[in-house]
Amino acid sequence: MPVASAPAVQISTATETEINEHAPTSLTVFRFADNPRILVLDFASLHEQGKMLNRVAAFVEKAGLPHDRVLTDGELDAAIRAQGDTVETFYLGHDYAAASLARFFALADSEQIMLDPAEQWLRALLQQEGWFASGVAAGLISLPAAGSDPRITASARAAILRHELSHGEFFSNPEYAEYVYKFWLTELTEDERGAVRDFLAKEGYDARVEELMFNEMQAYLMFTRDPTFFTPDMAAMTHERLATLQARFLAGMPAGWLRNVLASYQSAALAR
């Protein structure tokens, strides 16, 4: 008798506003309307989000942890405790490229790591979407429901979503990723790049991973406007210098939805 395949994961297409205003009672998967190569996992709780994605976070970007193998359950628990965190607080939002996710699952299989049911569900979603094929340019992001933690207010949820969507664009749009890389090298001074690395290292990112540094640079400096998460002094930068960098970034930015977002910030600033 043939084995029945798992039912397809239902995915709804939604705008940023629709995703932000959604109040999940269980995990909901969205395809971002402005860029269908971005998938958004909208979790009802930080615990649910952490169980699915914390091991991926450790593998891809967390400082002090190996990026060439997948942690066991015991190693992951110890790493989270060593940071003074819990499953819920390890990350508030997640973002990963299709290629990084494919590598994670391939290594987990080769190392015979026992994955959680939530991680196996994620594997099925990615298989459904064809993300394990070579050369796929796509991004997976996540966020928790407003009220799932005292820190996750409505404004914090909106800030997390905007930040993570910019990562989704970076992962899914090679032209944008190349633009960010060139901007990092040519528009920020060496001292400014060092200050950004220092800020990100304090946030727990592995500062040795250069692509991670310039990807986070664009997300924080250009698209994170909530002072709870970022202010220019956190990267040893003045407000005036940050405004100059934002204007220069906008001037050369590829056309598209994310450019429109940055332009709207500039328009609002001029109107004040």
Where do the protein language model's features map onto the residues?
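N-terminal low-structure segments adjacent to metalloprotease catalytic domains
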Residues: 1-102, 255-272
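Short, solvent-exposed segments of well-ordered alpha helices
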Residues: 9-12, 17, 21, 152, ...
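Short catalytic/ligand-binding loop motif for oxyanion handling, primarily in non-cytosolic enzymes
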Residues: 23, 39, 49, 169, ...
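Metalloprotease/metallohydrolase-associated module, dominated by Zn2+-dependent proteases
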Residues: 24, 28, 33-36, 41, ...
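Short, flexible loop/turn elements at secondary-structure junctions
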Residues: 45, 144-147, 166, 174, ...
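Active-site scaffold of zinc-dependent metalloenzymes
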Residues: 80-162
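Active-site recognition of the HExxH zinc-binding catalytic motif
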Residues: 159-172
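Short acidic alpha-helical/loop segments enriched in Asp/Glu that coordinate divalent cations
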Residues: 174-187
